[in-house]
Structure formats: C-alpha cells, structure tokens
Design a protein with these regions (language model features):
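Short Pro-Gly-centered flexible turn/kink motifs
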Residues: 41, 110, 283-301
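Extended, loop-rich substrate-binding clefts of extracytoplasmic carbohydrate-active enzymes
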Residues: 21-26, 92-143, 155-160, 172-173, ...
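Short, Gly/Pro- and small/polar-rich lid/capping loops
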Residues: 19-35
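Acidic-aromatic substrate-binding/catalytic surfaces of carbohydrate-active enzymes
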Residues: 35-103, 256
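Terminal connector regions
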Residues: 299-328
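Short beta-strand elements of extracellular/lumenal beta-sandwich folds
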Residues: 143-151
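Bacterial N-terminal signal peptides
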Residues: 5-16
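A contiguous, surface-exposed recognition patch within enzymatic or periplasmic domains that forms
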Residues: 43-45, 51-57, 65, 153-161, ...
Length: 328
C-alpha cells in the first residue's frame, strides 16, 4: 500500500501542470499480485509485473477489455514454456519456433514515468535479448503511445525486426487499410505486397476485401487459423467490438526491408482470438544497441459501421485513424 501511495504521489507531482492527472498504481489483477494500472480517468491499461512485459488490459474505465485474456493462464508465472496469456507483447521477427517463442514467465522491472511506465524484462537466457514496453498515456482523452523495444545483449550483431502483437478479444472485426490505390493503365508497376502463409485460405468467409480495405472477422466457432500480411507506409488497423473501436497506427519506411516478404502489418485469427500486428524494418543490431517499434493507440465509443464498404469505412474509421495520431 505504501509503495502504491508513493508511486501515485511521485507521478502526480510531475504531472500537476497537465490537464488531467496520469495515475500509476500497483494493483492485483486476476490472480497476479504485482500488476500496475495506468489511467487518466477515462481509459486504463493494466501491465503485468509478475510476467511479461505484457499489457493485459486496455479499455475505458469500468468498460470491457478490448484485449484477449486466456483465463486459465492468468495469475500464473514461472512456466517452462511460453504462454500466450493475452494482451499486447513484443517479439522478434521473422518468427522462429524457438527464439521468437522464448518464455517471458518471470517478473519484470516496473519504472514509473511522468506519463505512464516502462515494463522491462530481464535478459532472456535463450536469446540474450532484453525486451521492454513503455506506455505514455495522454493526460486527457483516449490515446496512448506504446513503444516496444528489444536490446541486444549478446556478443554478436543480430538481424531481426521488432514486432508488436496485440491479441484482441473474441467476436470482433479487424480492419486495415491498403496503401493508396491507382488506376490502369497509369500505374503499371507492382506497388505493394499482400502476403500469404501456407495455411492462408482466401475462400474463408471471415475475410472480406474491398478496394481500399482488408477485413477479418473473429469467429469463436471457427478454429482454422488464418493470416495475411501487407505493407502500407501509413500502417494502421482497427478492431471493432461491441460498439467500441481500438485503433493502432505506426509509420513504415518503404526504403527499408521488412520481414515476411515486406510486411509492415499482419493479422491472424483462430477460434480463440484475433491478432493485429505491426512490424519494424529488419535491422542489424550491434551488441548493446536497441531497436523499437512505436505504435499510437486510440480507443473510441459509438463506432458501428452499417456495412463493410469503402464508403462506410471511410466515413466511420478514417476520422478515428487521424485522431489516433502517429502520422508524422
């Protein structure tokens, strides 16, 4: 209790000139005794301290969690193998069944900041990488900047990309934008990739394509995995769930090489969750250096497109993408 009071007092002193107070408080969450709640009074995030780094909850205060939670994995720690658990995490890409899936089942260091916190994991024995997530919540409103970082503590230069994965709750629809479209015969050269995996089935009814958008519906009754990737200099995705929308946005650099045949965005689903993922460029990272993937998040109410058409998604979602920020 004393530690919670000190944390809140320290953060409050720094943020006295802000429009609204950013609070960081230690709390119990679904069996974990060492979680941290970051809030500005309107939205809140819960970060695990016993495992991770993970953002296990994001939602309006008192509202639904937009993120997936695996109930049977909550409140636990110390497992030998990687646990999905739910929420938002940082990985290395391309995906490797051993190094990418390194366990994150031990306590993390929590460092309060003026606008949130940093959750920093210890160095992974398997990879000699150290992962951290920093949350910077707006003092008012419903936007957050989330920085996903990986530091190379090995003796060698390693090449990989930072990969920010957000697991969404069941029953929603993901929407992502394609890059600006052109016209034939003016634009004759290929412009951007649409990447398949070996298990991708474009005949699956959960997919829907329009000229400007890719949508994927999460179906709790369909256990078949689906995944696609794409590149967009203005990478963004939205997840629509029960009248609310989660938006994440980042910038991608077309002059750099991205993993998985050039993907800055990927989306995956099965019967348990849907994932929206952004990727940074492949980087040759020297010992002691850090790479990061910065995302801008927004949360919005009363978002209910009447149909998944270009015109309706333009009307409903594009203003929210702009409001989320990250266009610079």
């Amino acid at each position: 209790m004393l530690r919670t009071i000190l944390l809140m007092s320290w953060v409050g002193l720094i943020t006295t000139n802000m429009v609204a107070s950013v609070k960081v408080e230690k709390t119990e969450y679904k069996g974990w005794q060492n979680c941290y709640r970051v809030t500005n009074g309107e939205i809140e995030l819960i970060v695990t301290g016993d495992v991770g780094p993970r953002i296990i909850r994001f939602g309006f205060v008192g509202g639904q969690n937009m993120f997936k939670e695996f109930a049977e994995q909550l409140g636990k720690s110390g497992e030998e193998k990687f646990q999905l658990r739910g929420g938002d995490r940082v990985w290395k890409a391309p995906e490797d069944p051993v190094a990418t899936w390194a366990p994150d089942n031990v306590p993390v260091q929590i460092i309060p900041t003026a606008t949130g916190l940093i959750a920093r994991a210890p160095i992974e024995p398997l990879t000699n990488l150290q992962k951290e997530i920093e949350i910077a919540i707006a003092p008012s409103g419903t936007t957050v900047t989330v920085s996903h970082r990986i530091t190379n503590h090995s003796l060698f230069t390693l090449e990989f990309a930072p990969w920010a994965l957000t697991m969404m709750a069941q029953g929603g629809i993901a929407v992502s934008g394609f890059p600006p479209r052109g016209r034939h015969p003016i634009n004759l050269e290929a412009t951007n990739p649409l990447v398949m995996w070996a298990y991708t089935d474009l005949a699956d009814p959960r997919w829907k394509f329009t000229k400007k958008y890719l949508t994927l519906r999460q179906d709790p009754n369909n256990k078949e995995a689906q995944k696609l990737g794409l590149f967009n200099p203005d990478t963004w995705a939205a997840y629509l769930l029960n009248g609310e929308a989660f938006v994440k946005r980042t910038k991608a650099d077309a002059s750099k090489t991205y993993p998985d045949f050039g993907c800055s965005f990927e989306t995956f689903t099965n019967n348990e969750f849907l994932e929206i993922e952004t990727l940074g460029p492949l980087t040759k990272l020297s010992p002691g250096h850090t790479v990061e993937q910065v995302e801008h998040w927004g949360l919005y109410r009363k978002v209910q497109p009447t149909e998944l058409t270009d015109q309706e998604l333009d009307r409903v979602l594009l203003p929210l993408v702009q409001a989320t920020g990250g266009a610079e």
